[in-house]
Amino acid sequence: MRGGRVLGYVYVDAVFYNPFDYTEFVQGRRRLEDVRRSVLKALVDTGATFPALPEDVIEKLGLPIYSEVEAETATGREKVKLALAIIQIEDRTAASYVIVRPRGTTPLVGVVALEQMGFRVDPATGKLIKGLPLML
C-alpha cells in the first residue's frame, strides 16, 4: 500500500527491522527471513521529526536504547528514549533514530525517514508519492 487516508490521516504499511540483524543480512551473514522485524500500519506524521514505536515493539525487535534526551513533543517538553531501527516502506529503506513511546500507542513514521526514502505526502489524495531522497 502506498498510503491511504483514514479520517484525514495517512497510514502506510511499514516494516521496522533490528539494525544489527539487518546489517548481517546486507553482509550476507543472515537470511532476510531471520532478521527480527515488525510489520505495522504506521501513521505518517509530517509534523514529527523521527519515527516512533510503542515500547512493546521496541522490546520485540530487541532494539537497544541509545540515549535519553529532553525533547519538544506533541504533548510538550519531555524526556524521550531513542533507539535505532531500519525502516522499509515499499522497496525503500532508511536507518533512523526511533522514539520509544508507551505501549499501545500508534506507530509513527516521521519526516526524516520519509525524506531519506524519497517520499512526500500528496495533501490532495493523502497518498505517498515517490521521488528522489532528500540529502540536503
Regions found by a protein language model. Name each.
Residues 1-136:
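Pepsin/retropepsin-fold aspartyl endopeptidases
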